[in-house]
């Protein structure tokens, strides 16, 4: 294991639009060592949130990673399957978002995010997980229909 906690190499992200693609982040590279404090600073629209979403693989469509490597604790995140990265994210990565509106995964429903926590951290699956999700949603007065969107 190296002393690098995070290594981003030549990361590029594009938004694929009907009229073509638009580069959001182009060939960004940096590394963070274990115990190092790091800040990602830039103007609004400069790609900070896009970089963070890319490194934890939560980019909402139409954004796609078109190039690069994201290595966290010697694991190439971009080479993992969707299920593998989901488990890795839950066990190895913590992020504090600047805004509460960005705290949830933008590409998953609230229902599925709650279910993931139950499955990964409490080993509750299937019908038991579905019932627990409904119970938790009722506690905060969110309908299951709203939690699916």
What are these regions (language model features)?
Residues 1-149:
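ABC transporter nucleotide-binding domains
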């Amino acid at each position: 294991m190296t002393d690098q906690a995070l290594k981003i190499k030549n990361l590029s992200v594009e938004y694929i639009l009907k009229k073509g693609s638009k580069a959001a982040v182009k060939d960004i590279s940096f590394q963070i060592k274990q115990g190092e404090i790091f800040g990602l600073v830039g103007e609004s629209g400069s790609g900070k949130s896009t970089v963070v979403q890319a490194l934890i693989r939560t980019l909402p469509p139409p954004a796609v990673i078109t190039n690069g490597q994201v290595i966290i604790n010697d694991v190439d995140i971009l080479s993992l399957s969707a299920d593998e990265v989901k488990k890795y994210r839950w066990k190895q990565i913590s992020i504090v978002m600047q805004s509460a509106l960005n705290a949830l995964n933008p590409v998953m429903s609230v229902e599925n995010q709650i279910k993931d926590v139950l499955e990964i951290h409490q080993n509750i699956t299937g019908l038991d997980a579905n019932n627990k999700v409904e119970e938790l949603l009722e506690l905060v007065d969110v309908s299951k229909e709203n939690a699916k969107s």
